[in-house]
Amino acid sequence: MRIALGIQYDGAAFCGWQAQPHGNTVQDALERALAEFARVPLHTTVAGRTDTGVHGLGQVVHFDTELDRADFSWVRGTNAFLPPTVAVQWAKSMPDAFHARFSAFERTYYYALYVHPVRSPMLDGRAGWIHTPLDDDAMRAAAAHLLGEHDFSAFRSSECQSKTPVKHLYEIDIRRVGHFLHFRFRANAFLHHMVRNLMGCLVAVGRGRYPADWVADVLAGRDRNRAAPTFMADGLYLAHVGYPAEFAVPPAQLGSVPWSSVWADLDPQP
């Protein structure tokens, strides 16, 4: 039997998603809790591995088990053994054809950026921060150069294990609400550090360090050294993973973050 789970977690509390010998990752915490509840070891497969400090709103995993339990029992039972920084939001029995990673056709990330002369301790680990003003229109113009199918080698980390740097970036939406800038990135898939590297370049343009068409030159050059430094992880959230309708994967519980209303007019599953 294949079970899918929707997971939310505070990435600031963990050293990324993927299991490590020290055991302080989201996968480690989840698999320990599953083993406690199921009384047998269970291995999870994830839709997308997130880095240290990156949060999960709509993360999806699957695992195989011989245990026959009601879907919601997996939610309550697993949550009973999870730390406060991780929670299972839903569970659903799936056909064997479902795969958390390979069945997904798109991923959406949000980035929350606090733009203010003084940092806020209340936002530590929850939002990125920059103390200088940003030009929204310049960043939108730069973002337009990045849309479509491209070789994103200039925006991947040296540790990226993706088989190809070619990805299709469907959307970059930038919205300002008060002192916050909210970014929405949607693509078929992302490279390691790709969103944070895109953020670094957009912010550099927003600060006036480069013209908007500079990002087109960076993209065409396929050289990571020509791009801006990797931006901080604090404000980055894996918000949604898209699957074919046949699997009826429940939507992410975006209402659990205070700024979710920014995207209220957008379909969570485009």
Curated annotation (Swiss-Prot):
Its EC number is 5.4.99.12. InterPro entries: PsdUridine_synth_cat_dom_sf (IPR020103), PsdUridine_synth_TruA (IPR001406), PsdUridine_synth_TruA_a/b_dom (IPR020097), PsdUridine_synth_TruA_C (IPR020095), TruA/RsuA/RluB/E/F_N (IPR020094). The active site is at D51 (nucleophile). Belongs to the tRNA pseudouridine synthase TruA family. Substrate binds at Y109. This is tRNA pseudouridine synthase A. HAMAP family: TruA. It is an enzyme of class 5 (isomerase). The keyword Isomerase applies. It catalyses: uridine(38/39/40) in tRNA = pseudouridine(38/39/40) in tRNA. PANTHER family: PSEUDOURIDYLATE SYNTHASE, TRNA PSEUDOURIDINE SYNTHASE-LIKE 1. GO terms for biological process: tRNA pseudouridine synthesis. Transmembrane segments: none annotated. Homodimer. Keywords: Isomerase, tRNA processing. GO terms for molecular function: RNA binding; tRNA pseudouridine(38-40) synthase activity. The keyword tRNA processing applies. Formation of pseudouridine at positions 38, 39 and 40 in the anticodon stem and loop of transfer RNAs. It comes from the Bacteria. The lineage of its organism: Bacteria, Pseudomonadati, Pseudomonadota, Betaproteobacteria, Burkholderiales.
